Amino acid sequence: KNFLCSADLKEFIETYHLNLSMDGSLNPRDVFGSHDDADHVYNTPRAWFMERYLNPNTYRWDGALADFTPVSDDLPWCMVPEKKITVEDVKYVLSGHYQGTPYDPYGSYGDKSMRGAYRSIGINRNDFMALIQIRPDMEADCRPVEWIAYGSNAFNALVPFYADVEETPEYLNNTTGRVSTENFYWSSRLIAAMADASYNKSLFHVERYQERVAAKGHELINRYDARLSLIHISEPTR
């Protein structure tokens, strides 16, 4: 009753005897998921990292006494985060490479044996990232904001667009077939290529770049939200 699903999902599970529980309870992961060895490299660790970040105090995630580890098949199927989620939270999760854990492929201290053991969410083969921010307190024509980034998520920066716009600045909309710093797409790819090869030296600069782009994005959205609010007041039927 708490989740969206197909109207006939219960009938489908019963017809094909898919519920594997002994007590009649339903675990969707057991019914429709998998526990392959590959999951313990590509999927389960990523879910562990996300839940660890969004619910750091709900469970013990690290150490010998951890409630859940990167290879736990019984990770919570869904959770309510400990606080409201921001655009920056989503960006961090989708850029994750197990920062602060022994599994960070960019790690430079501690035990090296487990670095890169699990596939990161933010890897150097990322090419595009987008998230939709729905703002219920805004008018319909400016309620959704789409945040977009190009290149590797570990090094890229999100820029915001009103979802209803039909044109965007040349620097942002033109990818070109030629590698160049004259557009946002290739600039993002170039930053990632250089920073990936010199992570520890580049991290400080990359983080400052990401923070400044995000701050400018929020500043622009706030500025034009205010202008649009004046339009809505003067033209209430708009």
Locations of regions flagged by a protein language model:
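Extended, regular secondary-structure scaffolds
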Residues: 1-80
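Long, compositionally biased low-complexity segments
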Residues: 44-54, 58-103, 107-117, 121-126, ...
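Substrate-recognition/cap regions that form aromatic- and gly/pro-loop-enriched pockets
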Residues: 107-225
